[in-house]
Amino acid sequence: MGDKEMSEYYDPMLYLSAPGNANTMGCTVTLGEPIDGDILAEAAELLRERFPYFYIRVEKTENDLVPIPNPLPLTVRNTWEPIVFHTEASNYHLMAIKYEGKRLAVEILHGLTDGAGFLPYIKSLLFVYLSKKYHLSLDSTGFRLPGQEIPEAESGNPFAHLNIDAAEAPLYQKKPVKDFYRINPGDRGENHVFYVRLPEQEVMRYCRENDGSPNALMAVILARAIRKADPESEKTINITIAEYIARN
């Protein structure tokens, strides 16, 4: 794959961090008092030792993206405007922090991690920030902090045993889907909204115990419910989930 094709393929996955870009994700936290940007930046820099795999930039090679350590400071900005990853504005990082008033947000390239891998960073950032801001000695149990050993399962390459380059192209083929299952097969005027309520704590407990994602669990539950309600249909079931979760 040439440089031009590489650029067209990878650029959308590397750079823009904005609400409409599905290749990035973020977490917003609202505190009780205005954010101290200097302490927040200090906390972010301290966590570099514990989360080195988030403090990186990438180099494009002939057919791959190679992550390498990024010694430049992680950007901590007093603004709520989007930022472009892997540019001078973000110090060529694939993660950035912003704050405004009492709220802060950490944005990251989704290709680096998912929610399960991102949440420990958020928790640890808040732990260090609050400890320094209020001079607290908090129980560190359950937090990932500097000085701890980083397990291989956390930072290793799960695909190291696979020789992707040796596989013959195309790697994956799927027959085109001509039609999807529709709960409301009629005109738009006949559509209905169905509400399904699940206990949040039970859902999260199940996901943690099985190392799974709430999105995947919801998709499976809804798909199986549809199959049970209409077992004669063989149409493909498409589940779309809005990835916006607000917690007070």
Give the ranges of each region predicted by the language model.
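Acyl-thioester-dependent acyl-group transfer interface
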Residues: 1-61, 71-96, 228-248
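Non-catalytic, low-complexity flexible loops and terminal extensions
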Residues: 2-5, 112-120, 124-205
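Short, flexible turn/loop "capping" segments at secondary-structure junctions
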Residues: 18-24, 98-100, 185-188, 198
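Acyl activation and transfer enzymes in specialized metabolism, enriched
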Residues: 33-51, 107-123, 192-231
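Conserved alpha-helical substructure of the radical SAM core
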Residues: 97, 104-106
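Amphipathic alpha-helical scaffolding segments
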Residues: 123-126, 223-224, 239-243
